[in-house]
Amino acid sequence: MFRRYADTLTSEGFIRIVIHAVGRMKAGPERELADRYLDRAAKAGPAIGMELAGVSEIPESRARSTLERKREEGRKLLDFAQGGALILLDERGKNLSSRELGDRFASFRDSGFRQIVMAIGGPDGHDDAVRAAADLSISFGAQTWPHQLVRVMLAEQLYRLITILSGHPYHRD
């Protein structure tokens, strides 16, 4: 499933942002909140050369072993992310501030990448091959978060980093 938040932009200098998630987010308050932030990000992004293209969801693997599940999900992710910057949400990732994450996005955009794929793994996490291929791994802390809340937090951070890069006052500065 792919939910689109903006029409595809073809202008030079724009970078597409896509969220790739293992598992489907059901209707409910978490999805409504995530969609609200993603809609805001989609409207604000073009002013700074960023297009929120949408959310790609793939079903969780039904393979028997954890290793097989992670590999199967990882292959799909790597196929999807070809040619773009790959950012993993991963418990082993770096704990970046909103401004630092925004600076990384701007760096990817300014260095010629045409797409950023933000990847949320399945319940077993990311395969080692995916971790090795990632351009950046980030974490929302050492705690374990339900996937629905991770999506809300990611959506909010995308909106926040776009507003920071747009020059809106940021209360943490």
Curated annotation (Swiss-Prot):
Enzyme class, broadest EC rank: transferase
Keyword Transport: no
Catalytic reaction equation(s): pseudouridine(1915) in 23S rRNA + S-adenosyl-L-methionine = N(3)-methylpseudouridine(1915) in 23S rRNA + S-adenosyl-L-homocysteine + H(+)
A GO cellular component annotation in the UniProt record: cytoplasm
Residues annotated as signal peptide: none
An annotated Gene Ontology molecular function: rRNA (pseudouridine-N3-)-methyltransferase activity
Keywords for this protein: Cytoplasm, Methyltransferase, rRNA processing, S-adenosyl-L-methionine, Transferase
EC number(s) given by UniProt: 2.1.1.177
Subcellular location: Cytoplasm
Protein purpose: Specifically methylates the pseudouridine at position 1915 (m3Psi1915) in 23S rRNA.
Protein name listed in UniProt: Ribosomal RNA large subunit methyltransferase H
Lineage of the species this protein comes from: Bacteria, Pseudomonadati, Pseudomonadota, Alphaproteobacteria, Hyphomicrobiales
